[in-house]
Amino acid sequence: MKRIVCTLAALWAVFLVGRTAPALAHEDHVHEAVPVEKLGSVHFPISVGPEAQRNFDRAVALLHSFEYEEAQRGFREIADQDPKCGMAFWGIAMCNYHPIWGPTTQADFDRGRLASETAARLGGKTDREQSYIAAIATYYKDADHVDAPARRMAYEKAMESLHQRFPDDLEGTIFYALSILGNAPTTDKTYAVQKKAAALLNSVLPKAPDHPGVAHYLIHSLDYPGLAELALPAARAYSKIAPSAPHALHMPSHIFTRLGLWDESIRSNLAAQRAARAVMTKTHPGSTYFEELHEMDYLTYAYLQLGRYGDARRIVDAIHAVSQLNQEAPQAAFAFAAVPARYALERHQWGEAARLTVAPAWFPWDKFAWAEALTQTARGIGAARSGNVAESRMALARLDTLHQSLAGVKDGYDWADQLDVQRREVKGWIARAGRRDEEALTELRSAADLEDSLDKNPVTPGAMLPAREQLGDLLLDLGRARDAVTAYEEVLKSSPGRRNSIRGLAKAKRLSATGPSSSRP
């Protein structure tokens, strides 16, 4: 399978990167501003006149770049002009189903369900249009007694059927690939599902090299250790295909981060940040785009890996200054918590981490227990490592409560497992503070093994501190340098370029000549 994926990645290089080679030759200028809107080449034919068709194609292009709000506005304008256009309401329904981005808010779901029901009532004017309308209906209907995973799978099956009925429909193939990614298991390290989606997308590539969905979803398909390098052509092309979409400028940094290409990640996210602000100036003056916070988290991560602490500090200050969002999205919740926590933990400023608070106070944290857990984890680790065990236990108790609130929640990513990792990390450092060293090792080994079995959520560039990196730190602290070498090397296999693991590995190697060996890290 890997050979097939490699071959398909080579096809991307031939058909897409070759077309953008002149721009790619000047990396310092890859995100130049464009005077006209550029969202990629999309044509999704429906039964409307020429002007409405152009507007529909634009809205679908925005949808493929996850610019959901602007896409929804476009579909709504079509519906206002032609209230009997069922496909306009299909588009609105699609804008409120986010198969990769995480839990769907109740407001989004209700809005999408109403649009889906309207589309079903109006119907499509062709069998193909009707198939699209029927497919999205499988996600929204029966929500009172069918859980979200089952409805997402029903949508995937419906898109598979559509793809089989209309094999020459490029949009059907692309949306089918996205539906597959929405159901990819987080614990299958063969990535068979993701490779299936990548194969579908690469089959479309020769016919649609400038399609935003092909590049975008290929990045998501290959955003995993061992596969990320195959997505470099797509990453470096996507920002050329749709530079008017902030998410298209940010998305390449997922791959740059996976590969430790920090300078490219910074350039990508600075460009995305500028684009996000331009969008807000036009659509929500005075508000911050939640997508910008997502970009700021990736920027912080990259700055910290390069030791650019002053630049990272400026991001922290900017996060603290946010007073209004265009949407209370999961990306915003994660960034609000992660950015200050990263800044303290990556610098090993344990006292600073212990003093973190859940902020901003105006944000509805009760809707995002998994995000608050980031702050509590940083507090727990920081307090334990600075000698304040009582404070660490308080943070752990809050983590336990948050973990219980997520038990049985099945809507996309399993955050309960991630909280389990975080609880074990805090327990490990509490044990170390109490000189219960074997217990500390057991907890951190357990945390590292569990974290290694999971895939990170796309909302994050990476763990605040990888559990196995923390295990390496503990092993060094206990004088077990040889075991620490193994731990750090394992981290760098999946997260190349991590500053603390590189530094820890260098120190462990210096000490390992005389250090005792042990069982396993």
Regions found by a protein language model. Name each.
Residues T7-R19:
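Bacterial N-terminal signal peptides
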Residues T20-A25:
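Boundary at the C-terminal end of the N-terminal hydrophobic targeting segment
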Residues H26-D168, T173-A245, L249-R258, A271, ...:
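Short coil/linker segments at helix-helix boundaries
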Residues T377-G387, S392, D417-L450, L465-A481, ...:
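C-terminal substrate/ligand-recognition segments
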Residues R468-P521:
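C-terminal structured "cap/appendage" subdomains that terminate the fold
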